[in-house]
């Protein structure tokens, strides 16, 4: 992947077999250039710094026309940029409106925007990198150093891991906790064999080895086929 800044370099990159094109923010509104990029049919990573929604929409239409796989980066073109100007909420809008992948081109001096972006569905994080911010150059102060990059990558991996899936179900670790932490229906006091269960005869206590509280109403009116002591867990097999 590489970033061409004009049509000539774009064509040269295509000739040498580049696999994806990064469009820099300064070309977001360069329609003739975007059309040439679209014609390549290559995957496009589009930075949106300094842009407004309509400009992003215009660019996206071009790549949709040419059926380029597309990833949109939210970007704030200040070097470094202020955390409060990250505007990460727009990533959700990009994903919903354009049905494409999203990412963050981040120029802040914090790892927080990257982690928030991942929580919103970002699959790519771009950061400027330098061996040392003490080096000369206008890009150094907006770049991260090797140790910081290592920290960022670790935190992004952790964030992705913690994000999980959108279905709600107990994890494998939680399954081991259910028996001890959840509750069961137990006898409120000593109950004799043949007793017809009433709600005042039972209560809910740990552990969760017996009948779930979800079934509280279902056992009302059932007859015990054995004696149950106070606080003893009640099981389905205890009923006639």
Which positions does each model-derived feature cover?
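Catalytic cores and adjacent flexible loops of soluble metabolic enzymes
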Residues: 1-240
